[in-house]
Regions:
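Conserved ASCE/P-loop NTPase catalytic core
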Residues: 2-170
Length: 170
């Protein structure tokens, strides 16, 4: 898939408060995110993509969770990952876009109940929150999202973790 060109973050004229907020959010993950409000054409998504292109590459373990090599040992068992850590790769920080009509299952991921019933084992299909781990989650038109999806995003950001449970299985 061809990557579209990214407008340079430093070439955005004006919007100093927005640019500062984005920079601060990348420096301090404790901020948990930035809400940018503005009219169409005010460089909101351009700034986010431009900032992502500026961020340094990082090492991650290939797979749906984008774990760092340091995170892998503590998360491998809970996420049902191979005991032996795969070879890390170096990647650019991605921008994961949350579509307006997104469902809760698509955001959080889902437990495959068919596999649980048929094979007696848990199988989790990670969602967009897993894809956004160590990445930028971009939500355009947040006001058009279903309220329960917004609540889910806010809870996950505040808690720093997302737990999926279905019919007593988590």
């Amino acid at each position: 898939m061809a990557q579209r060109p990214v407008y340079p973050f430093c070439a955005i004229v004006g919007q100093e408060e927005m640019k500062l907020a984005l920079i601060l959010a990348t420096i301090s993950p404790d901020l948990s995110g930035v809400l940018i409000r503005g009219e169409k054409g005010t460089a909101k998504s351009t700034a986010v993509r431009g900032l992502a292109a500026l961020l340094p590459q990082h090492r991650e373990i290939p797979g749906p969770y984008h774990l760092s090599p340091d995170e892998y040992p503590t998360h491998a068992v809970a996420l049902n990952l191979p005991e032996v850590m795969p070879e890390p790769r170096t990647v650019q920080v991605p921008v994961v876009e949350l579509p307006v009509g997104v469902t809760e299952d698509r955001v959080t991921g889902t437990l495959d109940m068919e596999t649980a019933l048929r094979e007696g084992r848990r199988r989790f299909e990670p969602g967009l929150l897993a894809a956004a781990h160590r990445a930028i989650l971009y939500v355009d038109e947040v006001n058009l999202l279903d309220d329960h999806v917004v609540d889910l995003l806010l809870d996950s950001a505040a808690m720093g973790v997302n737990t999926v449970e279905r019919e007593g299985v988590s």
